[in-house]
C-alpha cells in the first residue's frame, strides 16, 4: 500500500561522494529519506554515467530494490557546459545528445523526472538567437521525452530567463506537452523580486516536485537553513492549500563536508519542523 506521507528526498551532492549507489541509498535510508535525486552535472565524472554499461545500470536498479529507497529524479545540470541555446552548432549538438542519453538512461533505470536547467547559455552572452535555439532545443527534447514517457521539468533558476514560475509557464504553454512540467526551487524563487506565494499558486497543476533550500539576494547556494530569506512555513502552507501532494527534495552541497551525514540530519530536522508547523507532517 502506498504511503500517504509527504515524500521527502535528499540531493546526491548532500551525501558523501563516490559511485557506490548501494552505500548511498543505505545511508539515505538510515537518515530517514524516501528517495535520492541523482546529479548529472557538467563534470566528466558525472557525465560518464550516461554511458554506463547494462551491468552498471542494473546495479543501480538492484540497489533501489534492495534498500527500498527510490531514485525517481535526475538533476541534469550538464547543459551549463553544453547549452541548448549555444550558437556553436557542435556544442548545441552535444547538448542534444546529452539529453537523448539522459532520457534513455532514465528509461532504463526507472527515473521518472529529469530536472532541466533553465539556461539558454551559461558561460556566453545571451541574445535573441540563443533564446530561439533554446526554445527549439526544448521542443526537440520534449519530443524525445514523450516517446520514452519521461517527464522533463524546468527548474526555477538563479538566472533571469527562468527566475519565476510565470516565465516557466510561458515555456509550458509554448510546448503544450504533458511531458514538460515545472520543478520549482523555493530558494531560487524567493531570492528574486517575486510574489512567492502567488507564483506557487500559479504553478499548481504543473509542479511535479519542489526543491527546498535557503537563499539570500544574489546568493543561491550553501546558505544554511534559517539564515536566508525563504519563508518556508508559508511556502509549505501555500503548496498544501493549493493541493500539491508531490515530493520535496532537500538540496544541499555537503558531500565534501567533514561529516556530510550530520549536516544532512540537521537540515532534515530543521525542514521537517517547518513542515510540521505548516501542518504537512506530524511534529517530532
Swiss-Prot record:
It catalyses: L-ribulose 5-phosphate = L-xylulose 5-phosphate. PANTHER family: ISOMERASE (PTHR43489), L-RIBULOSE-5-PHOSPHATE 3-EPIMERASE ULAE (PTHR43489:SF8). Keywords: Isomerase. The gene is ulaE. Gene3D superfamilies: Divalent-metal-dependent TIM barrel enzymes (3.20.20.150). Signal peptide: none annotated. GO terms for molecular function: intramolecular oxidoreductase activity, interconverting aldoses and ketoses; L-ribulose-5-phosphate 3-epimerase activity. Pathway: Cofactor degradation; L-ascorbate degradation; D-xylulose 5-phosphate from L-ascorbate: step 3/4. One of its GO terms (biological process) is L-ascorbic acid catabolic process. This is L-ribulose-5-phosphate 3-epimerase UlaE. Its EC number is 5.1.3.22. NCBIfam families: hxl6Piso_put, PRK13209.1, PRK13210.1.
